[in-house]
Regions:
Chain B
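Conserved ABC ATPase signature
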Residues: 133-137, 141
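ABC-family nucleotide-binding domains
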Residues: 168
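Helix-to-loop junction immediately C-terminal to a conserved catalytic motif
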Residues: 51
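Conserved ABC ATPase "signature" region
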Residues: 111-129
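Conserved catalytic motifs of ABC-family nucleotide-binding domains
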Residues: 88-97, 198
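Conserved ABC transporter NBD signature motif
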Residues: 59-69, 77
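Catalytic Walker B motif of ABC-type/P-loop ATPase nucleotide-binding domains
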Residues: 158-161
Length: 235, 217
């Protein structure tokens, strides 16, 4: 099958609303967003705390957070597989080869990205924001929300980068999800499978969806950043 | 007269270098002070320590009859003392929201909030900037918004770090004109500055940091 023929077939699949294809997209989006929703609050809070506080071992924490960015997803998949397998410590959950298992993996993959980017965004922020909040009687919690509000574009970039890393990973989803048709097959595991079978049309169609999702997420960020100099809350 | 705030054994080191060592500093209720000293003498650091923004070594304070540590900064001081930066920073909301920041943070009566903010904006002459983006304000406007943001909290002690630095002409005069009105309203005020017009304000006591010691004149 030539590239032109495969691409034409891919558009035909997308346009005729192929149910199997769109179910794969749905599983990917659902597991990615669920993983990100679970990872974002702890990662952002941890990133903020590491950025704002001086404590023994802080430099090691920063180093670990940044080093975790380059962890191969297949290694995370392997560790999670061992944890979730029948004899593993979390085997009783029955999450292996299930969507909750993929979500757990996506959460672990997204967490370091969100943490490291939030840490960098908060560290880059003028320290007078936190000082001004404190000097005007804000509680520690309110200081955190005020600082994160000022660093919101960096935090949003963290979420979008996390989304990109999670939705495009294949190793963990394949190992923990098992690539079961109609259940745990995601965009990336489907592309890997269909390509190995020589069905390039579905692979290209899913690739187009993946790129479109990435463009859409980044477009949202660009739109929000474009609004950065408009005053926010009014009284 | 019982001081509003008494600070004992306040000292600060930057590495091996002793920045200052102050045996005792008394701030009277409703009194105004200008704090002078050469660049690097520790004026800003002293104000930041009093405002709870800088760590201090073992040091105790008496505030309103209470014996408190200066670090970790105690809640009664956090609600009574407001520090204003030399170059104030504005949250990326509106000017009015910036002025309301401390009131919102302290959870005061929301029905009163709008009238308090309106009154503070009127006092600082920034009512016309109400819904503006603070990022677009001039240095003088930012300083006046910062003074309004501090004043609206009715602090017992206001710490102003070189409020006229880098301002000139009308902007500087507008800021200078606001400071006596703050003093008249009964707050104690310490102004770190080099500005002769502030140093020579009537009724202001002078403090000078020199060679790590605080001189009262």
């Amino acid at each position: 099958m030539g590239l032109l023929e495969a691409t034409t077939g891919a558009f035909a699949l997308l346009l005729r609303g192929d149910a199997a294809l769109w179910h794969i997209v749905w599983v990917s989006v659902k597991t990615t967003l669920s993983g990100l929703i679970l990872a974002t609050p702890p990662a952002v809070v941890l990133g903020y705390l590491i950025a704002m506080h001086r404590f023994p071992g802080r430099r090691i924490a920063v180093w670990l957070a940044q080093a975790a960015l380059s962890l191969p997803t297949v290694l995370i998949g392997l560790l999670l597989y061992l944890m979730l397998s029948r004899r593993g410590p979390l085997g009783d959950l029955g999450w292996l080869f299930s969507q909750p298992g993929i979500i757990a993996g996506q959460c672990l993959i997204g967490l370091p990205v969100l943490l490291a980017f939030t840490l960098a965004a908060v560290q880059a922020l003028d320290p007078r924001y936190a000082e001004t909040a404190l000097a005007h009687g804000a509680s520690r919690l309110r200081v955190m929300f005020s600082v994160l509000h000022e660093a919101r574009y960096g935090v949003m970039a963290a979420v979008i980068s996390g989304f990109g890393r999670v939705i495009s990973e294949v190793g963990c989803a394949l190992m923990v999800g098992g690539n079961i048709e109609g259940h745990t097959r995601t965009i990336t595991t489907a592309i890997a499978l269909e390509t190995s079978k020589g069905d390039f049309a579905q692979g290209i169609a899913l690739g187009i969806v993946l790129v479109t999702l990435a463009l859409a997420m980044n477009g949202v960020l660009v739109l929000l950043q474009g609004d950065a100099h408009n005053p926010g809350a009014r009284l | 007269m019982t001081p509003l705030l008494s600070v004992h054994a306040l000292h600060k080191r930057h590495g091996e270098r002793l920045l200052f060592d102050i045996g005792r500093l008394d701030i009277a209720a409703g009194a105004a002070y200008v704090l002078t000293g050469a660049n690097g003498s520790g004026k800003s650091t002293l104000l930041r320590m009093l405002g709870g923004l800088e760590r201090s070594a073992a040091c105790s304070v008496e505030f309103d009859g209470l014996h408190l540590p200066l670090y970790p900064y105690p809640r009664p001081l956090r609600h009574a003392i407001v520090y204003v930066h030399q170059h104030p920073i504005m949250f990326s909301t509106s000017v009015a929201h910036n002025i309301a920041y401390g009131l919102l943070a302290r959870g005061g009566d929301r029905r009163l909030l709008r009238s308090l903010v309106d009154e503070a904006m009127d006092w600082a002459g920034v009512t016309h900037l109400r819904d503006n983006d603070p990022a677009r304000l001039s240095g003088g406007e930012k300083q006046r918004v910062a003074l309004a943001r501090a004043r609206v909290l009715q602090p017992r002690l206001l710490l102003l770090d070189e409020p006229t630095a880098n301002l000139d002409g009308a902007a500087r005069e507008q800021v200078i004109a606001l400071i006596p009105t703050l003093i008249d309203q009964g707050a104690s005020v310490i102004v770190a500055c080099h500005d002769r017009d502030l140093i020579n304000l009537p009724g202001v006591q002078r403090l000078k940091l020199r060679d790590g010691r605080l001189e009262s004149r």
